[in-house]
């Protein structure tokens, strides 16, 4: 590149010298110029020979001087300009040799011209003397000034913008129209055709008509407009029960072969469902259990089903749907007491009718779950004492093993009346009003005002047959938790918290026999009647072995049985009030004085080691009620005691979080200063 520039500079200087000589000869003004034609002829062919290559290759970038010399290629040139360079490099030696010849010829011509120029007439010009240029001298100089370039076109200027080559085809600086910049013949190729671009989405008139049934079946596989298979097409209720209960799966699998609901209305026994995990639901209980699965599912609001079920299913069934099939097993429990009492058979048949009577003064047990609104509350309140009583009343008869054989000594003391009375009343009678269980429980009211969840479960809920009544068998449930958990539900910590008990009339006391007396479960003080009865919760109670204590409320016509082992009751040992009882002894339970004396105080009679405490009385805080003492146990008549149900505390109103506006700016700055100072 440097050699090429040097050569061009030399050629440029030579051409300048030629012009100077021409102007000098012209100013001499010689009239006859014999040598001029020859010199001009010799020069003209040279210029003519040298000019064609110049014209053929116009300069790529014009220099400041305006001379159309060969372009000095910039470093930014692309492959196109490199091809042009090859041509230029071939033509350059030719140009230089021609210019040198011209210089050699011009030198003698000028020498000859000088002496002869004196005789030439000024202002007269010879034709063909080589001076007849079409433009006057002024125009030549003005042409130089016209070629004055802008800063961005001048290569010597730092603001020069190279515009040649592929790299600069989009450089639009200083250009008004694109045609100058865009290289010709370079059009962007189309990558796709736009002709049929929107054919798939075009509006076609012939497609707007409704399709025929065959077309619908070919497209969708079935006729989406037909109302015959409306079971598959009708929109489902979006709200499904949580934890997809097995009832949902049964419903889907049994749909084709499911019999209609007329069994429920007519009372005809329907074939049993083939499930093994149920408690063998009898024929007449299938009706209610089927209505709940409809109720819990998504078909509740359809008119076709409303005609079949005139009465809506009971809320207890809706609750059970969320709990799954485990809750249903407790409802179906009452059915099989046929093994126990054949006379209960007609009573059960009308039980679905009883369930639907909502306006009874004292509703039967299945009506109580009306208050359960949500699944989580069902889970929590399932362990409540009243609820365990209800569910246990349904299940225990079927699940309890038959009582073990009674020893003859005990059998002699037992009268068959309690057994029959208890068994006949397991099922509520078909008539409205109070059932047998409710009447029995109203006599055996247990106050639950100071109920402690940590107590051992020696107080069984209602409906559980007393082991004392059933004959000397072991207690069927050792723990209240065992009864509550029997539904297959995991016992949670939240179920052990103290909650308001719904109905205080739901409990009576199951008096355990001391064969199964566990001293570890009698650690706390036993409830005693005193001035502040609610201060000590009931801890449990025991009955001495082989003795039958008849409750005056249940069997008022029986004489009290004799105590067969009176030597277990030791004489009371009196201690000074300040002296603590011996360490190994139990805390002092309620000890009654001799049978004809009432003892309402807080006694401090510890027992000597090895002695068992006598059973305390029924746990009633009302000490003024009439009471009877049988065999060292004080019984109170519950009918004369008004037990006030403990009102549940009102729900705490959720108060919104108050959002205070930020303090004003000046106070904030003051506080910041105080903090920084401190």
From Swiss-Prot:
Comp. bias intervals (Basic residues): 1-10
List all Low complexity biased stretches.
Answer: 25-38
Q: Where is the composition biased (Polar residues)?
A: 124-133, 258-269
Recall the GO molecular function terms of this protein's record: mRNA binding
UniProt feature, compositional bias: Acidic residues: 14-24
Q: Where is this region: Disordered?
A: 1-412, 637-678
Question: What are the protein's UniProt keywords?
Answer: Cell projection, Cytoplasm, mRNA processing, mRNA splicing, mRNA transport, Nonsense-mediated mRNA decay, Nucleus, RNA-binding, Spliceosome, Translation regulation, Transport
What spans are recorded as compositionally biased (Basic and acidic residues)? 40-60, 166-183, 191-216, 225-235, 247-257, 311-324, 346-358, 384-393, 663-678
Q: Name one GO biological process term.
A: mRNA splicing, via spliceosome
Subcellular location(s) of the protein: Cytoplasm; Cytoplasm, Perinuclear region; Nucleus; Nucleus speckle
Which GO terms of the cellular component aspect does the record hold?
cytoplasmic stress granule; dendrite; exon-exon junction complex; nuclear speck; nucleus; perinuclear region of cytoplasm; U2-type catalytic step 1 spliceosome
State the family it belongs to.
Answer: Belongs to the CASC3 family.
Reported function: Required for pre-mRNA splicing as component of the spliceosome. Core component of the splicing-dependent multiprotein exon junction complex (EJC) deposited at splice junctions on mRNAs. The EJC is a dynamic structure consisting of core proteins and several peripheral nuclear and cytoplasmic associated factors that join the complex only transiently either during EJC assembly or during subsequent mRNA metabolism.
Q: Which PANTHER family match?
A: PROTEIN CASC3 (PTHR13434:SF0)
Q: How does it assemble?
A: Identified in the spliceosome C complex. Component of the mRNA splicing-dependent exon junction complex (EJC), which contains at least casc3, eif4a3, magoh, nxf1 and rbm8a. Forms homooligomers.
Name of the protein described by the UniProt record: Protein CASC3
What gene name is given for the protein in this entry? casc3
